Amino acid sequence: MAKKSKNLLAALEKIDSTKLYSVEEAVALAKETNFAKFDASVEVAYNLNIDVRKADQQIRGAMVLPNGTGKTSRVLVFARGAKAEEAKAAGADFVGEDDLVAKINGGWLDFDVVIATPDMMAVVGRLGRVLGPRNLMPNPKTGTVTMDVAKAVEESKGGKITYRADKAGIVQALIGKVSFDADKLVENFKAFHDVMAKAKPATAKGTYMTSVFITTTQGVGIKVDPNSL
């Protein structure tokens, strides 16, 4: 614990909490100040001036990062017949129907993404209390309720991320790993920023992005100048 605190203090000394860093500076600092002994995740956080209680100010969606996430997602698909075969051929890790419902209700959660064909949502709906709180419930807005299961599986395996504003209007997203080249992290960051900018609700008032941060697992938040993105 003492060693971790020492590393954290060393990281804090290199970061000026009053400064807005350019995206290139912020990414370089995030990599430099990472002290985790594993390939830490790199994440961004957007504090948005929105009121998520209003239906037209809820922000939620999905995108495929240009350089992936560095993470291999375990994909589960609820489908039957030909669609089940398509999912398997596309590389889905688990494909099934009621058998998977029983398994999940029994406590099994060894998957990262859940996809379903529209006709299976009545079955998947029985898992609302399990999948909902974990942000795993399939949703048309994130492309996880679809007839094109092959595309959904391939995107989930190839760097697709989902995002959603929480009650405080904060959106967090994974943009890669510390081991990524800096330019690839910058490219991913800029791609996500473009999505956030376009997601601005028409009814949002005042400054939309109040602050933007980048951090690594166990790392320190670094404030980024949105204008550099």
Swiss-Prot record:
Q: Name one GO biological process term.
A: translation
Q: This protein's superkingdom? A: Bacteria
GO cellular-component terms in the record? Answer: large ribosomal subunit
> What InterPro entries is this protein classified in?
Ribosom_uL1_bac-type, Ribosomal_uL1, Ribosomal_uL1-like, Ribosomal_uL1/biogenesis, Ribosomal_uL1_3-a/b-sand, Ribosomal_uL1_CS
Molecular-function annotations in GO: rRNA binding; structural constituent of ribosome; tRNA binding
Q: Which UniProt keywords apply?
A: Repressor, Ribonucleoprotein, Ribosomal protein, RNA-binding, rRNA-binding, Translation regulation, tRNA-binding
Q: Does the keyword Ribosomal protein apply?
A: yes
Q: What does this protein do?
A: Binds directly to 23S rRNA. The L1 stalk is quite mobile in the ribosome, and is involved in E site tRNA release. Protein L1 is also a translational repressor protein, it controls the translation of the L11 operon by binding to its mRNA.
NCBIfam families reported in the protein's UniProt record: rplA_bact
Q: Which family does it belong to?
A: Belongs to the universal ribosomal protein uL1 family.
Q: How does it assemble?
A: Part of the 50S ribosomal subunit.
Its name, as the record gives it, is Large ribosomal subunit protein uL1
Query: What lineage does UniProt assign to this protein's organism?
Result: Bacteria, Bacillati, Bacillota, Bacilli, Lactobacillales
